[in-house]
Amino acid sequence: NTYPVFPLCHLQPSRTTMTTLKTRKPCITTISEICDSEDHTKNHQHTKLPPVIKDLVANWSSNDCFEHISPVALPSHPAIIDIIRQTRSLLFPGYFSAAKLHQNNLEYFIGQETTDLYDKLTEQIMMAIRHDCRRMLQPCTNCEERSHRLALAFIETLPQVTATLATDIRATLAGDPATQSPDEVIFCYPGLLAISIYRIAHELYLLKVPIIPRIMTEHAHSLTGIDIHPGATIGPGFFIDHGTGVVIGETTIIGKDVRLYQGVTLGALSLPRDAGEKLRFIKRHPTIEDNVIIYANSTILGGDTVIGANAIIGGNIWLTESVQAGLKVMLKRPELIYT
């Protein structure tokens, strides 16, 4: 069977339109001519880019915009995410790797993963230190030797981090009847994911590793909606239920066996515009003592605010003052109106 072929210009114009058509470009009838025409259009538009490029370069040459134009590379965001993944595979063997683990190969697996993690982390720490030194105009700190030392110090904290995360998992199992097993908590719970990444980042923060801890916790923030600053101090047995919208500021101190629900903010009071640098190392966020429960959407602010042990803070509470140990803070029951 044959099928009729219709050229792109098969329609014949009427006499009334002939005058108009004479002024138009010749009709394109082949694919190659169409492609050539498109390439011509693209190339013509490219000629308009150089002035924009010059404006961008001029912006970066001023002090009004931010750039990183330097022979020293910044830490790699994808590489740091991979470090998180690999660290979690060490903290929870068998959960986040494709390897089939048993007692005969476990030590080999842990050895290989730990060595690989050490090398990757050393490289990223060295980039972070070099960038920080150049940005702050600091004298040379022997960044290569320092990065190896810091990476090793971090690796040495992993047994304790594993033990602390085990208490967080047990707290989740004890506090949430909806969970069926530790596997479900480890695989599925955004609260534990955010806490795990926080505990990894916190150890690097304590070692004064630049920028990498914050990249880690902000990655967790983007995944879970839970914002925990790596500088916060959080005790064992920590449980965040549901999690979305939780904020925990840099100088927050949280005791052991504390439970938070979604939307809780442990934050700082509003600061004057020029006060940030002066208060950078001052305690700005609350202290939550042992065995406290804070229900959904409550906000607790201020560095002098202390929530005493075993206190319960109800939902939708706004607090800027301390609460004694063992007290319950609840809103007065609102009046419902039916119409």
Task: Label the model's feature ranges.
Residues 5-11, 18-215:
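Terminal amphipathic alpha-helical/low-complexity segments used for targeting or macromolecular assembly
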Residues 11-14, 326:
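Amphipathic alpha-helical interaction segments
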Residues 221-337:
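Structural signal for interior beta-strand "rungs" in well-ordered beta-sheet cores
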